[in-house]
A protein has these predicted regions:
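Enriched for short, Lys/Arg-rich terminal
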Residues: 1-14, 75-113
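Arg/Lys-rich, positively charged N-terminal/basic patches that mediate binding to nucleic acids
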Residues: 1-49
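A short, surface-exposed loop/turn module that caps and links secondary-structure elements
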Residues: 51-80
């Protein structure tokens, strides 16, 4: 799956229960993941499951993330693992239940380790 195919699939999926939005930094990080030969199909499957409210396997380790960004009332930052050292972070809005995907990358890239 190419970068353009990835974003086309996100935009055109009618099976999603919730709307999917992304930031410019997320788009740049997806391009970087593609250049690093990471499988964008894996990322798409995780996002697709989240947007359909499907339960991800325990290997994805979905959890809330504190201290990452400025949370506003009714929203929280969440994180899961696409692969062991490949993270996906998003803002989950409780009132609208819209996921806004913000970043991908390894633990070292994400948290300056």
């Amino acid at each position: 799956m190419t970068v353009s195919e990835f974003f086309e699939a996100l935009a055109s999926n009618e099976d999603f229960i919730f709307a999917v939005a992304h930031t410019n930094s997320f788009k740049k990080n997806v391009k970087l993941c593609y250049k690093q030969n990471l499988d964008l199909n894996e990322l798409y499957q995780v996002i697709s499951s989240l947007a359909k409210l499907e339960t991800l396997p325990s290997k994805n380790h979905v959890h809330s993330l504190t201290g990452y960004g400025k949370e506003r009332k009714g929203e929280k930052y969440m994180e899961c693992h696409v692969a062991p050292d490949w993270l996906l972070i998003w803002v989950q809005k409780d009132d609208e239940m819209i996921f806004i995907f913000t970043n991908t990358g390894s633990h070292a890239n994400m948290f300056g380790m």
